[in-house]
């Protein structure tokens, strides 16, 4: 009898070969929540199919979660465009339904914020939408506080929930 244990999810840095897979995850999760490209959500970002190129720049980092050979989620950090140089943004945190509830988003967010600290950032900002209740609960648990105004120039005009955390 051959008992092969299922693989554990692996968190690793984004590679060029991951571009199509992580774009697919972001589009699928966005569709699940009704976050359409005609509005100011991540799914409308012009660089969605080129995330490796974006996150290979200094001050940027992105990780994917791979499970049984498939990319099932990801998230990253980048300097907050149009804001103070000590503020980064937690970006593009998306996970397929089958992998949610396993603590991976929390682990990834903590890892990203630690990397941001090491890069010299002092604060971490994020934008999301009220449709993503589970994500908001996670961010609150991680110490993010709601703020009443947008920071920077993210282009995500329909993301009405804005949060900030000291690193």
Swiss-Prot record:
PROSITE patterns noted in UniProt: GNAT
Top-level taxon of the source organism: Bacteria
Record family assignment: Belongs to the acetyltransferase family.
Coiled coil (residue ranges): none
SUPFAM superfamilies documented for this protein: Acyl-CoA N-acyltransferases (Nat)
Lineage of source species: Bacteria, Pseudomonadati, Pseudomonadota, Gammaproteobacteria, Enterobacterales
Keyword Coiled coil: no
Protein name: Uncharacterized N-acetyltransferase YjgM
């Amino acid at each position: 009898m051959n008992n092969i244990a299922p693989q554990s999810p692996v968190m690793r840095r984004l590679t060029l070969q991951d571009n199509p897979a992580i774009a697919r995850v972001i589009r699928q999760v966005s569709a699940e929540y009704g976050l359409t490209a005609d509005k100011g959500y991540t799914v409308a970002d012009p660089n969605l199919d080129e995330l490796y190129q974006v996150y290979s720049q200094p001050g940027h980092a992105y990780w994917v979660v791979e499970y049984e050979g498939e990319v099932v989620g990801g998230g990253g950090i980048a300097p907050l465009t149009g804001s103070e140089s000590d503020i980064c943004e937690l970006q593009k945190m998306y996970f397929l339904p089958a992998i949610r509830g396993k603590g991976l988003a929390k682990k990834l967010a903590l890892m990203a914020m630690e990397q941001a600290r090491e890069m010299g950032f002092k604060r971490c900002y994020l934008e999301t939408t009220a449709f993503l209740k589970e994500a908001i609960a996670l961010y609150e648990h991680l110490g993010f506080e709601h703020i009443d105004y947008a920071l920077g120039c993210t282009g995500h005009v329909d993301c009405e929930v804005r949060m900030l955390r000291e690193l």
